[in-house]
Amino acid sequence: MPVSRFAVFGHPIAHSLSPRIHTEFGRQMGVALDYLAFDVAPDAFRVSLEHFVAEGGYGANVTLPLKEAAFEVCTTLSARARRAGAVNTLSRVDGVWHGENTDGIGLVRNLTERHGLDLRGRRALLLGAGGAARGVAPALLDAGITEMVIVNRSPERADMLCDALGEPGRVSARYWGDLGDLGNFELIVNATSIGNTSDMRTFSLPRSLLDSMTVAVDLNYGSAAVPFLAWAHAVETRYAIDGLGMLVEQAAESFSLWHGRRPDTDPVYTVLHSEYGVPGRS
Protein backbone atom coordinates (compact mmCIF):
# COMPACT_ATOMS: atom_id res chain seq x y z
CA MET A 1 0.00 0.00 0.00
CA PRO A 2 1.54 3.36 -1.01
CA VAL A 3 2.44 5.84 1.70
CA SER A 4 0.36 9.02 1.61
CA ARG A 5 2.33 12.17 0.75
CA PHE A 6 1.87 15.45 2.58
CA ALA A 7 3.91 18.63 2.84
CA VAL A 8 4.21 22.12 4.20
CA PHE A 9 4.87 25.05 1.85
CA GLY A 10 6.34 28.37 2.99
CA HIS A 11 9.12 30.89 2.47
CA PRO A 12 11.34 30.46 4.43
CA ILE A 13 10.55 26.96 5.69
CA ALA A 14 13.73 25.52 7.22
CA HIS A 15 12.51 26.40 10.72
CA SER A 16 9.18 24.57 10.34
CA LEU A 17 8.26 21.95 12.93
CA SER A 18 5.32 20.68 10.87
CA PRO A 19 7.13 17.63 9.42
CA ARG A 20 8.11 16.52 12.91
CA ILE A 21 4.63 17.16 14.34
CA HIS A 22 2.80 15.23 11.62
CA THR A 23 5.30 12.39 11.73
CA GLU A 24 4.70 12.09 15.49
CA PHE A 25 0.93 12.21 14.97
CA GLY A 26 1.20 9.48 12.35
CA ARG A 27 3.25 7.30 14.69
CA GLN A 28 0.74 7.85 17.49
CA MET A 29 -2.26 6.99 15.29
CA GLY A 30 -0.64 4.18 13.31
CA VAL A 31 -0.82 6.11 10.03
CA ALA A 32 2.01 5.69 7.52
CA LEU A 33 2.78 9.00 5.85
CA ASP A 34 5.52 10.96 4.14
CA TYR A 35 5.58 14.64 5.13
CA LEU A 36 8.02 17.04 3.43
CA ALA A 37 8.85 20.75 3.58
CA PHE A 38 9.13 22.94 0.48
CA ASP A 39 10.61 26.43 0.44
CA VAL A 40 8.60 28.16 -2.27
CA ALA A 41 8.31 31.84 -3.14
CA PRO A 42 4.79 33.13 -3.87
CA ASP A 43 5.33 33.40 -7.62
CA ALA A 44 6.31 29.72 -7.81
CA PHE A 45 3.62 28.35 -5.49
CA ARG A 46 1.07 27.20 -8.06
CA VAL A 47 3.66 25.36 -10.15
CA SER A 48 5.14 23.73 -7.05
CA LEU A 49 1.70 22.45 -6.08
CA GLU A 50 1.28 20.94 -9.53
CA HIS A 51 4.58 19.08 -9.15
CA PHE A 52 3.52 17.93 -5.68
CA VAL A 53 0.27 16.48 -7.04
CA ALA A 54 2.13 14.78 -9.90
CA GLU A 55 4.31 13.06 -7.31
CA GLY A 56 1.31 11.75 -5.37
CA GLY A 57 0.66 14.64 -3.00
CA TYR A 58 -2.68 14.50 -1.23
CA GLY A 59 -2.64 17.27 1.39
CA ALA A 60 -0.55 20.26 2.35
CA ASN A 61 -0.16 22.83 5.06
CA VAL A 62 0.64 26.38 4.03
CA THR A 63 2.49 28.95 6.10
CA LEU A 64 3.71 32.50 5.57
CA PRO A 65 3.68 34.16 3.11
CA LEU A 66 1.51 31.81 1.05
CA LYS A 67 -1.84 31.60 2.87
CA GLU A 68 -3.62 34.08 0.66
CA ALA A 69 -2.06 32.51 -2.45
CA ALA A 70 -3.35 29.14 -1.26
CA PHE A 71 -6.84 30.64 -1.06
CA GLU A 72 -6.60 31.54 -4.74
CA VAL A 73 -5.70 28.02 -5.94
CA CYS A 74 -8.72 26.38 -4.31
CA THR A 75 -11.78 25.29 -6.25
CA THR A 76 -13.79 24.71 -3.07
CA LEU A 77 -13.46 26.34 0.34
CA SER A 78 -14.77 25.75 3.83
CA ALA A 79 -16.88 28.47 5.40
CA ARG A 80 -13.99 29.29 7.75
CA ALA A 81 -11.50 29.65 4.91
CA ARG A 82 -13.89 31.74 2.84
CA ARG A 83 -14.51 34.09 5.75
CA ALA A 84 -10.80 34.38 6.50
CA GLY A 85 -9.74 34.87 2.88
CA ALA A 86 -6.72 32.68 3.66
CA VAL A 87 -5.99 28.95 3.61
CA ASN A 88 -3.51 26.98 5.69
CA THR A 89 -4.70 23.45 4.86
CA LEU A 90 -5.13 22.01 1.37
CA SER A 91 -6.79 18.67 0.57
CA ARG A 92 -6.93 17.06 -2.87
CA VAL A 93 -10.59 16.12 -3.45
CA ASP A 94 -11.89 14.82 -6.78
CA GLY A 95 -8.91 16.22 -8.63
CA VAL A 96 -9.12 19.76 -7.25
CA TRP A 97 -7.91 21.59 -4.15
CA HIS A 98 -10.23 22.11 -1.20
CA GLY A 99 -9.13 24.83 1.22
CA GLU A 100 -9.58 25.00 4.98
CA ASN A 101 -8.17 27.25 7.68
CA THR A 102 -7.36 25.56 10.98
CA ASP A 103 -5.29 28.42 12.45
CA GLY A 104 -8.16 30.03 14.31
CA ILE A 105 -9.53 26.90 15.92
CA GLY A 106 -5.95 25.94 16.80
CA LEU A 107 -5.42 29.26 18.58
CA VAL A 108 -8.73 29.11 20.43
CA ARG A 109 -8.15 25.50 21.53
CA ASN A 110 -4.71 26.41 22.82
CA LEU A 111 -5.94 29.42 24.77
CA THR A 112 -9.12 27.92 26.18
CA GLU A 113 -8.24 24.25 26.68
CA ARG A 114 -4.50 24.28 27.35
CA HIS A 115 -4.27 27.62 29.17
CA GLY A 116 -7.77 27.72 30.63
CA LEU A 117 -8.68 31.19 29.35
CA ASP A 118 -12.23 32.42 28.82
CA LEU A 119 -12.29 34.65 25.74
CA ARG A 120 -15.90 35.73 26.12
CA GLY A 121 -16.42 39.43 26.70
CA ARG A 122 -12.81 40.40 26.06
CA ARG A 123 -11.66 43.44 24.11
CA ALA A 124 -8.93 42.31 21.69
CA LEU A 125 -6.16 44.07 19.80
CA LEU A 126 -4.97 42.22 16.69
CA LEU A 127 -1.58 43.34 15.38
CA GLY A 128 -1.31 42.53 11.68
CA ALA A 129 -3.73 41.97 8.80
CA GLY A 130 -1.97 39.37 6.64
CA GLY A 131 -2.61 35.66 6.25
CA ALA A 132 -1.93 34.82 9.91
CA ALA A 133 -4.30 37.51 11.18
CA ARG A 134 -6.96 36.52 8.66
CA GLY A 135 -6.80 32.94 9.89
CA VAL A 136 -7.39 33.69 13.57
CA ALA A 137 -9.72 36.71 13.51
CA PRO A 138 -12.97 34.84 12.68
CA ALA A 139 -12.36 32.18 15.34
CA LEU A 140 -11.65 34.80 18.02
CA LEU A 141 -14.93 36.52 17.21
CA ASP A 142 -16.76 33.19 17.29
CA ALA A 143 -15.20 32.48 20.70
CA GLY A 144 -16.96 35.52 22.13
CA ILE A 145 -14.59 38.45 21.72
CA THR A 146 -16.72 41.56 22.30
CA GLU A 147 -14.64 44.03 20.31
CA MET A 148 -11.65 43.61 17.99
CA VAL A 149 -9.38 46.43 16.87
CA ILE A 150 -7.08 45.57 13.96
CA VAL A 151 -3.88 47.59 13.59
CA ASN A 152 -1.53 47.15 10.64
CA ARG A 153 1.33 49.17 9.22
CA SER A 154 -0.55 49.17 5.91
CA PRO A 155 -3.99 50.52 6.90
CA GLU A 156 -5.52 49.42 3.60
CA ARG A 157 -4.98 45.77 4.52
CA ALA A 158 -6.54 46.30 7.94
CA ASP A 159 -9.58 47.87 6.27
CA MET A 160 -9.82 44.92 3.87
CA LEU A 161 -9.77 42.44 6.75
CA CYS A 162 -12.46 44.40 8.60
CA ASP A 163 -14.65 44.34 5.50
CA ALA A 164 -14.09 40.60 5.04
CA LEU A 165 -15.11 39.83 8.62
CA GLY A 166 -18.40 41.62 8.05
CA GLU A 167 -19.02 42.70 11.64
CA PRO A 168 -18.71 46.50 11.70
CA GLY A 169 -20.27 46.70 15.14
CA ARG A 170 -17.50 44.58 16.67
CA VAL A 171 -14.47 45.08 14.42
CA SER A 172 -12.61 48.26 13.49
CA ALA A 173 -9.29 49.18 11.86
CA ARG A 174 -6.84 51.78 13.12
CA TYR A 175 -3.42 53.13 12.17
CA TRP A 176 -0.26 51.81 13.85
CA GLY A 177 0.45 55.35 14.98
CA ASP A 178 -2.84 55.36 16.90
CA LEU A 179 -1.78 52.61 19.32
CA GLY A 180 -1.34 55.04 22.19
CA ASP A 181 -4.91 56.29 21.83
CA LEU A 182 -6.85 53.02 21.73
CA GLY A 183 -7.38 52.38 25.43
CA ASN A 184 -6.66 49.05 27.08
CA PHE A 185 -7.26 45.48 26.00
CA GLU A 186 -7.71 42.15 27.76
CA LEU A 187 -6.14 40.32 24.81
CA ILE A 188 -3.29 41.43 22.53
CA VAL A 189 -2.44 39.09 19.65
CA ASN A 190 0.70 39.58 17.57
CA ALA A 191 0.03 38.23 14.08
CA THR A 192 2.94 40.08 12.46
CA SER A 193 6.42 38.86 11.54
CA ILE A 194 7.98 41.71 13.49
CA GLY A 195 9.86 39.19 15.62
CA ASN A 196 11.97 38.26 12.61
CA THR A 197 13.20 41.82 12.16
CA SER A 198 13.09 43.51 15.58
CA ASP A 199 15.72 43.63 18.26
CA MET A 200 14.16 42.60 21.57
CA ARG A 201 15.79 45.66 23.17
CA THR A 202 13.98 48.09 20.86
CA PHE A 203 10.54 46.51 20.34
CA SER A 204 7.88 48.25 22.38
CA LEU A 205 4.18 49.01 22.55
CA PRO A 206 2.44 51.69 24.64
CA ARG A 207 1.71 50.75 28.25
CA SER A 208 -1.71 52.34 27.83
CA LEU A 209 -2.77 49.19 25.97
CA LEU A 210 -2.62 47.18 29.18
CA ASP A 211 -4.88 46.54 32.12
CA SER A 212 -4.43 44.12 35.01
CA MET A 213 -5.94 41.23 33.02
CA THR A 214 -4.11 41.62 29.70
CA VAL A 215 -3.06 38.40 27.98
CA ALA A 216 -0.29 38.77 25.37
CA VAL A 217 -0.21 36.12 22.64
CA ASP A 218 2.32 35.77 19.83
CA LEU A 219 1.37 33.54 16.90
CA ASN A 220 5.09 32.99 16.31
CA TYR A 221 7.22 30.54 18.27
CA GLY A 222 10.91 30.13 19.01
CA SER A 223 13.21 33.08 18.35
CA ALA A 224 10.55 34.89 16.29
CA ALA A 225 8.38 35.23 19.41
CA VAL A 226 11.14 36.60 21.65
CA PRO A 227 10.80 40.38 21.00
CA PHE A 228 7.04 40.52 21.59
CA LEU A 229 7.09 38.23 24.61
CA ALA A 230 10.11 40.05 26.06
CA TRP A 231 8.03 43.21 25.91
CA ALA A 232 5.12 41.37 27.55
CA HIS A 233 7.37 40.24 30.39
CA ALA A 234 8.85 43.71 30.82
CA VAL A 235 5.43 45.34 31.21
CA GLU A 236 4.15 42.41 33.30
CA THR A 237 1.12 41.29 31.32
CA ARG A 238 -0.95 38.76 33.22
CA TYR A 239 -0.07 35.99 30.77
CA ALA A 240 2.47 35.77 27.94
CA ILE A 241 1.94 32.89 25.50
CA ASP A 242 3.86 31.92 22.37
CA GLY A 243 2.47 30.26 19.25
CA LEU A 244 3.79 26.75 19.76
CA GLY A 245 0.56 25.42 21.26
CA MET A 246 -1.45 26.92 18.42
CA LEU A 247 0.91 25.29 15.90
CA VAL A 248 0.36 21.85 17.42
CA GLU A 249 -3.42 22.30 17.70
CA GLN A 250 -3.89 23.54 14.13
CA ALA A 251 -1.74 20.64 12.93
CA ALA A 252 -4.02 18.21 14.77
CA GLU A 253 -7.03 19.78 13.02
CA SER A 254 -5.32 19.33 9.64
CA PHE A 255 -4.40 15.74 10.49
CA SER A 256 -8.04 15.05 11.39
CA LEU A 257 -9.24 16.47 8.07
CA TRP A 258 -6.88 14.22 6.13
CA HIS A 259 -7.11 11.03 8.18
CA GLY A 260 -10.49 11.19 9.93
CA ARG A 261 -9.05 10.99 13.45
CA ARG A 262 -7.72 13.69 15.76
CA PRO A 263 -4.47 12.83 17.60
CA ASP A 264 -3.67 13.60 21.23
CA THR A 265 -1.76 16.88 21.15
CA ASP A 266 -0.43 16.97 24.71
CA PRO A 267 2.50 14.52 24.29
CA VAL A 268 3.75 16.31 21.17
CA TYR A 269 3.32 19.76 22.70
CA THR A 270 5.15 18.77 25.88
CA VAL A 271 8.20 17.55 23.97
CA LEU A 272 8.34 20.52 21.61
CA HIS A 273 7.76 23.07 24.37
CA SER A 274 10.75 21.70 26.27
CA GLU A 275 12.90 22.31 23.19
CA TYR A 276 11.44 25.38 21.49
CA GLY A 277 9.03 27.07 23.87
CA VAL A 278 9.68 30.68 24.84
CA PRO A 279 9.44 31.08 28.63
CA GLY A 280 6.08 32.62 29.47
CA ARG A 281 3.42 32.95 32.11
CA SER A 282 0.23 30.97 31.74
From Swiss-Prot:
Function: Involved in the biosynthesis of the chorismate, which leads to the biosynthesis of aromatic amino acids. Catalyzes the reversible NADPH linked reduction of 3-dehydroshikimate (DHSA) to yield shikimate (SA).
UniProtKB keywords: Amino-acid biosynthesis, Aromatic amino acid biosynthesis, NADP, Oxidoreductase
Pfam families membership: SDH_C, Shikimate_DH, Shikimate_dh_N
Binding positions for shikimate per the UniProt entry: S16, L17, S18, T63, N88, D103, Y221
GO biological process, one term: aromatic amino acid family biosynthetic process
Active-site annotation: K67
Protein family according to the UniProt entry: Belongs to the shikimate dehydrogenase family.
E.C. numbers: 1.1.1.25
Catalytic reaction list: shikimate + NADP(+) = 3-dehydroshikimate + NADPH + H(+)
Annotated Gene3D superfamilies: Leucine Dehydrogenase, chain A, domain 1, NAD(P)-binding Rossmann-like Domain
Taxonomic source organism: Xylella fastidiosa (strain M12)
Residues at which NADP(+) binds: G128, A129, G130, G131, A132, L219, G243
Pathway note: Metabolic intermediate biosynthesis; chorismate biosynthesis; chorismate from D-erythrose 4-phosphate and phosphoenolpyruvate: step 4/7
Superkingdom, natural source: Bacteria
Subunit structure: Homodimer.
Record PANTHER family: BIFUNCTIONAL 3-DEHYDROQUINATE DEHYDRATASE_SHIKIMATE DEHYDROGENASE, CHLOROPLASTIC (PTHR21089:SF1), SHIKIMATE DEHYDROGENASE (PTHR21089)
Gene Ontology molecular-function annotations: NADP binding; shikimate 3-dehydrogenase (NADP+) activity
Name of the molecule in the record: Shikimate dehydrogenase (NADP(+))
GO cellular component, as recorded: cytosol
